[in-house]
C-alpha cells in the first residue's frame, strides 16, 4: 500500500472492510475442517468470529473520516527498551494482534484462520471474489458521477461504508468471553464448528456472489458443500474408530497388565511379611480399576453414538455431521479424561506406545 496515494489506500481498506463484513460467513467456511475447529480460538490461533484488526492509529483515521474531522497523528514514538547502550528506534505504530483473524500489519492484510493442512486456494477464492463484488457495487454507484464531483462522491461513499461496516473492526483480545458477547451484539457470525458454518455456503447471498462472478455453478456449489460435510464426517469417524482401537487393543490391556503386577507385588509382600502394609498398592489398584471401568462404560457409549451418527450419513449428511460434532466429540472427550488419568499411573515400559513425554522430549537412535 505504500506505493499508492492516500485516497487509494483509504479506498483499498474500505473495500476490504466491506468485503469481509458482507461475506464473513464464507471466509469462515473457506477454512472449515474438523482439525481447524480444534485450533481456532486457542494456541495462538484466531477465534472463529471473523473480525478485522486495524490498529489504533488507522482506526482513528477512519473515525475522523466518518465524523468529518481532521486527523491529528501522534507522531513517532521512541521505543523504550531500558538499555542506554543500545540504539534508539521508533515504535511500530501498526502494533500486532495475534488473536485477530484478519489483521492489517504495516502495508498489508493478513488472513490467519487457515489451518496448516488446508489449501490456501479456498480463502483466496472467497477473498478475491468478495472484493471484486464490492468493487463492482462501488463502480455502479460512482459511474455516473461527473469528474468535478468525483472526489466528494468518493469521500461520501467512504464515510457511508465506514458507518455501515465498522462493526467488523475489533482491535482487542479475541480470546475473551466479553468479545464473543460483544460480537453477538454487533450481529457478527460466531460459527464455532464446521457443521455450524457449512449450511451458510448455500445461502442466497453467497450463492449469488459465487455464481454471478462465474466462480461456481449452482451444481458445483452444492457439490462442494456436500464434499466438505462428507470430509468432516469421515474425519471424525476415523478419529473415533482410532480411539476405540487404541483403548481396546493397547491401553486397557496395559492397565490390566499393570494391575496384575500390582496384585502380585502386594501378595508377594504379604507372603514374606504378613503384617506389612500394602495400602499403596491397594490404593493404586483401586484407582486403576475405577478408571478402567469408567473407560469401558464411556467407550461403549462412544461406539453406540458413532454408529448412530454413521446411520444418518446416507439419510441426512448435515444431521450426521452435527451428531459427530455435538455427541461423538463429547463422548471422545469423556473417554480421554479417564484414559489420560490411567496413562499417568502406568509405567512407560508397560505402555505399548510412546508417551507425550517421549514424543516431545526424547531422542532415540
For the regions a language model picked out, list residue spans one by one.
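Structured core elements
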Residues: 85, 101-103, 108-112, 243-252, ...
